[in-house]
Structures are given as structure tokens and as C-alpha cells.
Amino acid sequence: YETAADVVVIEPGKDLQVDLENLEKALINHKDRRLKIGSFTACSNVTGVRTPYHAMARLMHEHGGVAFIDFAASAPYEAINMHPENPMEKLDAVMFSPHKFLGGPGSSGVLIFDSSLYHSKVPDQPGGGTVDWTNAWGEYKFIDNIEIREDGGTPGFLQAIKTALAIELKNQMNTEMMHEREKELVALAFRKLKKIKGIHILAENITDRLGIISFYADSIHYNMFVRLLSDRFGVQVRGGCACAGTYGHYLLNVSHDKSKRITDKINLGDLSEKPGWVRLSLHPTMKDKELRFILDAIEEIVKYHPVWKDDYIYDKHTNEFRHKLGTTHNGRIDSWFKLT
């Protein structure tokens, strides 16, 4: 919807997982389209559930399309293979955000694509260092090298260095070892959360996932839950729909009519009925005792929420909760920004 493309959502199959038959049906229905781009996520940033992206790429290629895979959620923990043994399963483009890697904040985004896809004669963002020459009569020639031509202005040297270091750290940690550790953490979290009355895990039937667990609680607003975890226990999690509003309609079984009622209110500035959840991210470096502390905190919030919630005021325009005493900080923070 952000481009000139017609977006086709592939309906999920059983248990909301990828249905390759539905993908093929969509490709057949659009066989007359000259350009067919399969833009898929490698892993959900809401449930941690992986997708069969190589099989999806094969279907795209069999029907004359290309496959672009978003590894934002899984790149810090999983290997990325753009050229598997079967050439029909190759990935035409991948993208990921190194700032999600351990040690990655401050790095730049990464896009890797098959150069045969590039046909533009003018860079997306013209700037310094993108031309071989110019003259006094308005003539010029852009640099042939795609990477240089598309990197106008001063390159992000520090960002690139940090990206490389974060990837190297990932390689040293070993993806197989990280996977094994995440399995242990996910199992521990599932055992505890399933015992807490009123807690509902999204896609709880799938335990083979990355260390991403999203849940909601009966009668507790997700942003209230987030605020209490932070204020009472010093634990930071994310509340909302995690940039996955469309997926959220399936996860929370939101009908078109209900969605319309909610979005109409949002358009009027009232976010009070906007659906969402609490996302807990488990990292391979976490210790068991750290995770147990978080899980115990979740249980405490469920138990004492009826009392603790009275300390907060809800703003329907921001969908946030603020403490009645206001937000305060000690003077030490101010000193960070003083030059003398």
C-alpha cells in the first residue's frame, strides 16, 4: 500500500501458519501480471514463528515472480542463505536491521539484492559522490557501480563498521548454540505462563519458535501491563501491535465490522479500543533466573493489578498510562547534557 503495487494478502492455513497452496492459488489468479513480487517475512516478530520462505521463493520463481524476504526478526539469531542447493529456492533480495543484533544499536539497515533486478538509471537519492563527471552545459554521468551510485553523500562509516562487528559477534556466538538456548528459554516461559490464570499466549500451539512470546491478559490493558512491568519491576517489554496490525486481525480474530468500528474511533483520535498485546523478547544471553524474575513479575501484575492500576491515569488519545504523580527523574540525568 506504500507503493504503486496491488497488495495481495495470502490467507493463512491451519493454526494461522503459511499455506503454500493458498500462495500458489494467488499466483495463478494473477498469472497475467508482468511483475509479481513475493514480499514475505522470514519469522514473525509477534509470535517468533518461522515461515518456509525457501519453498515460498520456489513457488514465486515457478510462476515468474521474485522473492524478497524480511529477516528483521530472525537475522540476529539465524543463518541467512540466499542461494540454497535448489536454485529455484534462491532469495532475490533480503533485508534486515542490524540494530536488533546484540551490540547493533546505531548501525544502519542492510539490503542485499540480485543486481539483475536493478534497472534504474538515476539513484533513488542523488547526492555527492554519485557521478563520474559533470560539465558546464548540464551534462553528467552517474557512476556505474550500483552500491556507490545509491549511496550519495558521506557514507555511514561508523554505522557500517558497527554493522560488521555485530554480525561478527553473531557468528562467534554460533546460531546453532543460540537456537538451543532459545528453545530452553521458550520452554521455561511457556511452562510458567500457561499456569498463570488469565494469561493468553498468541499462537500458543506453536512452541518451535524464536525467543519471541506475545500475550495478553484478561481485563488488563496491554499498555498498563507494560507500564507496571517497567515501573514496578524494571522490565522493559513492548505493548501494542508491534507493526503487525494486519496479522493481529488474524491472531485476535477481529472481524471486518469490528475493525471498522475500531478504526473509525482511531480516526477521531480515540485509541481506547485499539487491539494489542505484550511482547516479551527472550535473548540467548539471558539467565534462567532473569527469566524467572520476569515471569514472577507477570504473575504479580495479574494478582495485584486491581490495586496498582489506581495509581495511573489513562489517555485515550495516546493510548498510554501515566502515573498520577507524574514523570520525574533526578538531577543526575540533567547533568549528562551539561558541557561544563
Labelled PLM ranges:
Residues 1-340:
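Pyridoxal 5′-phosphate
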